[in-house]
Amino acid sequence: SGVEAAIKDEIEAFKLSLPAGYSLESDGEADTAAESQGQIISSAAIFFVLIVIGLVAALNSFKQAGIILSVAILCIGLSFVGLVIGQQNYGFIATVGAIGLAGLAINDSIVVLSHIKEEAEKNGLTKAKLVEVVIRSTRHVLTTSATTIGGFLPLLFASIFFRPLAWGMVVGVIGSSIIAVFYIPAMFIYLKKIQS
């Protein structure tokens, strides 16, 4: 926390001035928060590996799984942008929000990518058809994003404790919708040669 950082140097100087045989140890919320944050990040790494395996199995393509994973990484960055926009401090709750957003953000991208793949396998895919598929998918993307953002609005305005999580999630979900509609089709075109 900010208070802990402000007095840390003074505490270290005080430790050095203690007489022989005396020591000073700190404990409390800061240590517990650091331990909890370490546990959640190590758990997230395990689940990240499971997500990769699941995506490769579902999409049957390492490249397409890579596209979806890049969306997750971009959206984690967007959650930190949300903290800046909302003028919130980074902490344990913000970390939980960023990790949760990684899973939530890929949903819209999977919907768009699966619609594109379905159309490509059925009829072949031109750029004009790609635009039609993305426009059709946009309704699903906007609906899921609007309901998710609506669910976080009470936390955004009413809850001080969960406000960092809510800001990160709301900005991340808005960003993930934009990414799903523009980035996913662009990457699909990049990976597959599509006729004009």
Write out the residue ranges for each language-model feature.
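Non-catalytic alpha-helical coupling and interface elements of nucleotide-dependent molecular machines
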Residues: I11-E12, L16, A45, G54, ...
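Transmembrane alpha-helices and their membrane-interface boundaries in multi-pass membrane transporters
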Residues: D108, A166, V170-S196
